Amino acid sequence: MIPIVIEESGRGERAFDIYSRLLRERIIFLGEAVTSDSANRIVAQMLFLEAEDPEKDIYLYINSPGGSVYDGLGIFDTMQHIKPDVHTVCVGLAASMGAFLLCAGTKGKRSSLQHSRIMIHQPLGGARGQASDIRIQADEILYLKERLNQELSDRTGQPLDRIQQDTDRDFFMSPGEAVEYGLIDSVIDKRPIQAVE
Protein backbone atom coordinates (compact mmCIF):
# COMPACT_ATOMS: atom_id res chain seq x y z
CA MET A 1 0.00 0.00 0.00
CA ILE A 2 1.40 3.39 -1.00
CA PRO A 3 0.86 6.18 1.55
CA ILE A 4 -1.21 9.20 0.51
CA VAL A 5 -0.30 12.77 1.46
CA ILE A 6 -2.99 15.45 1.76
CA GLU A 7 -2.04 19.05 0.99
CA GLU A 8 -4.24 22.00 1.78
CA SER A 9 -4.18 25.22 -0.21
CA GLY A 10 -6.45 28.18 -0.81
CA ARG A 11 -8.18 26.12 -3.50
CA GLY A 12 -8.93 23.14 -1.25
CA GLU A 13 -7.30 19.79 -0.58
CA ARG A 14 -5.28 17.63 -2.96
CA ALA A 15 -4.20 14.05 -2.40
CA PHE A 16 -0.88 12.73 -3.71
CA ASP A 17 0.74 9.35 -3.39
CA ILE A 18 3.97 9.85 -1.44
CA TYR A 19 6.22 9.18 -4.45
CA SER A 20 4.46 11.82 -6.57
CA ARG A 21 4.82 14.29 -3.72
CA LEU A 22 8.54 13.51 -3.41
CA LEU A 23 8.94 13.89 -7.18
CA ARG A 24 7.69 17.48 -6.86
CA GLU A 25 10.72 18.04 -4.62
CA ARG A 26 12.97 16.39 -7.27
CA ILE A 27 13.39 13.24 -5.16
CA ILE A 28 13.30 9.80 -6.81
CA PHE A 29 13.22 6.67 -4.67
CA LEU A 30 14.60 3.28 -5.73
CA GLY A 31 13.26 1.06 -2.95
CA GLU A 32 13.20 -2.30 -4.69
CA ALA A 33 15.20 -4.54 -6.99
CA VAL A 34 16.29 -3.06 -10.31
CA THR A 35 13.90 -4.49 -12.90
CA SER A 36 12.68 -3.25 -16.26
CA ASP A 37 9.61 -1.75 -14.53
CA SER A 38 11.56 0.07 -11.80
CA ALA A 39 14.23 1.22 -14.27
CA ASN A 40 11.65 2.55 -16.73
CA ARG A 41 9.96 4.53 -13.93
CA ILE A 42 13.27 6.01 -12.75
CA VAL A 43 14.43 6.90 -16.27
CA ALA A 44 11.06 8.53 -17.01
CA GLN A 45 11.20 10.51 -13.75
CA MET A 46 14.73 11.73 -14.49
CA LEU A 47 13.79 12.82 -18.00
CA PHE A 48 10.68 14.58 -16.66
CA LEU A 49 12.69 16.44 -14.00
CA GLU A 50 15.29 17.47 -16.56
CA ALA A 51 12.53 18.84 -18.81
CA GLU A 52 11.03 20.72 -15.84
CA ASP A 53 14.33 22.39 -14.87
CA PRO A 54 17.65 21.29 -16.39
CA GLU A 55 19.63 23.41 -13.89
CA LYS A 56 18.21 21.97 -10.64
CA ASP A 57 19.74 18.90 -9.01
CA ILE A 58 17.92 15.57 -8.77
CA TYR A 59 18.09 13.36 -5.65
CA LEU A 60 18.08 9.56 -6.05
CA TYR A 61 17.55 7.69 -2.77
CA ILE A 62 18.59 4.03 -2.99
CA ASN A 63 17.50 1.09 -0.84
CA SER A 64 17.98 -1.81 -3.24
CA PRO A 65 19.44 -5.33 -3.27
CA GLY A 66 20.45 -4.82 -6.90
CA GLY A 67 18.93 -6.56 -9.88
CA SER A 68 19.15 -6.57 -13.65
CA VAL A 69 22.44 -5.33 -15.05
CA TYR A 70 20.89 -4.23 -18.34
CA ASP A 71 18.13 -2.25 -16.64
CA GLY A 72 20.61 -0.75 -14.18
CA LEU A 73 22.83 0.36 -17.05
CA GLY A 74 19.79 2.10 -18.54
CA ILE A 75 19.46 4.13 -15.33
CA PHE A 76 23.24 4.71 -15.24
CA ASP A 77 23.35 5.98 -18.83
CA THR A 78 20.41 8.30 -18.18
CA MET A 79 22.15 9.71 -15.10
CA GLN A 80 25.18 10.52 -17.26
CA HIS A 81 23.05 11.84 -20.15
CA ILE A 82 20.83 14.34 -18.35
CA LYS A 83 22.01 17.84 -17.55
CA PRO A 84 21.09 18.10 -13.83
CA ASP A 85 23.54 16.77 -11.26
CA VAL A 86 22.27 13.62 -9.56
CA HIS A 87 22.78 13.32 -5.80
CA THR A 88 22.71 9.68 -4.71
CA VAL A 89 21.91 8.67 -1.13
CA CYS A 90 21.99 5.13 0.30
CA VAL A 91 19.24 4.49 2.84
CA GLY A 92 19.46 0.94 4.21
CA LEU A 93 21.16 -1.17 1.54
CA ALA A 94 22.79 -0.47 -1.79
CA ALA A 95 23.98 -3.84 -3.06
CA SER A 96 25.17 -5.03 -6.44
CA MET A 97 23.53 -2.77 -9.08
CA GLY A 98 22.22 -0.62 -6.22
CA ALA A 99 25.83 0.12 -5.19
CA PHE A 100 26.81 0.74 -8.81
CA LEU A 101 24.05 3.35 -9.14
CA LEU A 102 25.01 4.89 -5.79
CA CYS A 103 28.56 5.37 -7.10
CA ALA A 104 27.20 6.74 -10.41
CA GLY A 105 25.96 9.96 -8.82
CA THR A 106 27.69 13.25 -9.49
CA LYS A 107 31.16 13.30 -7.91
CA GLY A 108 30.99 15.14 -4.59
CA LYS A 109 27.25 14.44 -4.30
CA ARG A 110 27.23 10.73 -3.40
CA SER A 111 26.38 9.89 0.20
CA SER A 112 24.96 7.36 2.63
CA LEU A 113 23.10 7.42 5.90
CA GLN A 114 25.34 6.24 8.72
CA HIS A 115 23.89 2.75 9.36
CA SER A 116 23.45 1.70 5.73
CA ARG A 117 25.40 -1.11 4.09
CA ILE A 118 26.97 -1.08 0.65
CA MET A 119 27.99 -4.21 -1.26
CA ILE A 120 29.74 -4.74 -4.59
CA HIS A 121 30.27 -8.01 -6.45
CA GLN A 122 30.53 -9.39 -9.95
CA PRO A 123 27.44 -9.80 -12.16
CA LEU A 124 25.45 -12.96 -11.62
CA GLY A 125 23.91 -15.02 -14.35
CA GLY A 126 22.96 -18.47 -15.44
CA ALA A 127 22.67 -20.26 -18.72
CA ARG A 128 21.16 -23.42 -20.07
CA GLY A 129 20.80 -24.95 -23.45
CA GLN A 130 23.34 -26.06 -26.00
CA ALA A 131 27.03 -25.60 -25.31
CA SER A 132 27.29 -22.85 -27.93
CA ASP A 133 24.42 -20.92 -26.27
CA ILE A 134 26.05 -21.28 -22.86
CA ARG A 135 29.33 -19.94 -24.28
CA ILE A 136 27.52 -16.89 -25.70
CA GLN A 137 25.95 -16.17 -22.31
CA ALA A 138 29.28 -16.68 -20.51
CA ASP A 139 31.00 -14.27 -22.91
CA GLU A 140 28.27 -11.69 -22.29
CA ILE A 141 28.62 -11.99 -18.51
CA LEU A 142 32.39 -11.56 -18.81
CA TYR A 143 31.87 -8.48 -21.00
CA LEU A 144 29.47 -6.97 -18.45
CA LYS A 145 31.88 -7.78 -15.62
CA GLU A 146 34.72 -5.95 -17.40
CA ARG A 147 32.47 -2.97 -18.24
CA LEU A 148 31.15 -2.60 -14.67
CA ASN A 149 34.61 -3.04 -13.13
CA GLN A 150 36.07 -0.37 -15.42
CA GLU A 151 33.28 2.08 -14.51
CA LEU A 152 33.81 1.39 -10.79
CA SER A 153 37.55 1.92 -11.21
CA ASP A 154 37.00 5.20 -13.06
CA ARG A 155 34.51 6.48 -10.47
CA THR A 156 36.30 5.35 -7.30
CA GLY A 157 39.90 5.97 -8.31
CA GLN A 158 40.74 2.40 -7.30
CA PRO A 159 43.06 0.45 -9.61
CA LEU A 160 41.22 -1.96 -11.90
CA ASP A 161 42.98 -4.99 -10.41
CA ARG A 162 41.76 -4.01 -6.92
CA ILE A 163 38.18 -3.69 -8.22
CA GLN A 164 38.47 -7.09 -9.93
CA GLN A 165 39.71 -8.68 -6.71
CA ASP A 166 37.10 -7.01 -4.49
CA THR A 167 34.16 -7.82 -6.77
CA ASP A 168 35.15 -11.47 -7.13
CA ARG A 169 32.92 -12.21 -4.10
CA ASP A 170 30.41 -10.17 -2.08
CA PHE A 171 32.33 -7.20 -0.64
CA PHE A 172 30.39 -5.35 2.08
CA MET A 173 31.32 -1.89 3.34
CA SER A 174 30.13 0.52 5.97
CA PRO A 175 29.49 4.07 4.75
CA GLY A 176 32.84 5.19 6.20
CA GLU A 177 34.64 2.39 4.37
CA ALA A 178 32.76 3.30 1.18
CA VAL A 179 34.05 6.89 1.51
CA GLU A 180 37.63 5.60 1.89
CA TYR A 181 37.08 3.31 -1.11
CA GLY A 182 35.77 6.19 -3.24
CA LEU A 183 32.28 4.76 -3.83
CA ILE A 184 30.69 7.73 -2.05
CA ASP A 185 31.83 11.13 -0.88
CA SER A 186 30.21 11.57 2.54
CA VAL A 187 28.29 9.98 5.40
CA ILE A 188 25.14 11.72 6.59
CA ASP A 189 24.69 11.45 10.35
CA LYS A 190 22.17 14.28 10.78
CA ARG A 191 20.54 17.02 8.79
CA PRO A 192 22.35 20.34 8.75
CA ILE A 193 20.81 22.92 11.06
CA GLN A 194 19.04 25.66 9.12
CA ALA A 195 19.87 29.24 10.10
CA VAL A 196 16.97 31.09 11.72
CA GLU A 197 16.21 34.46 10.18
UniProtKB/Swiss-Prot annotation:
UniProt-recorded name of the protein: ATP-dependent Clp protease proteolytic subunit 2
GO molecular function, one term: ATPase binding
Disulfide feature: none
Compartments in which it is found: Cytoplasm
Family named by the database record: Belongs to the peptidase S14 family.
Pfam families according to UniProt: CLP_protease
Description of how the protein assembles with itself and partners: Fourteen ClpP subunits assemble into 2 heptameric rings which stack back to back to give a disk-like structure with a central cavity, resembling the structure of eukaryotic proteasomes.
Reactions listed under catalytic activity: Hydrolysis of proteins to small peptides in the presence of ATP and magnesium. alpha-casein is the usual test substrate. In the absence of ATP, only oligopeptides shorter than five residues are hydrolyzed (such as succinyl-Leu-Tyr-|-NHMec, and Leu-Tyr-Leu-|-Tyr-Trp, in which cleavage of the -Tyr-|-Leu- and -Tyr-|-Trp bonds also occurs)
GO cellular component: cytoplasm; endopeptidase Clp complex
Taxonomic superkingdom: Bacteria
GO biological process: protein quality control for misfolded or incompletely synthesized proteins
Cited function: Cleaves peptides in various proteins in a process that requires ATP hydrolysis. Has a chymotrypsin-like activity. Plays a major role in the degradation of misfolded proteins.
Keyword Cytoplasm attached: yes
InterPro entries: ClpP, ClpP/crotonase-like_dom_sf, ClpP/TepA, ClpP_Ser_AS
Organism annotation: Parasynechococcus marenigrum (strain WH8102)
Entry-linked SUPFAM superfamilies: ClpP/crotonase
Its EC number(s): 3.4.21.92
Keywords: Cytoplasm, Hydrolase, Protease, Serine protease
GN (gene name): clpP2
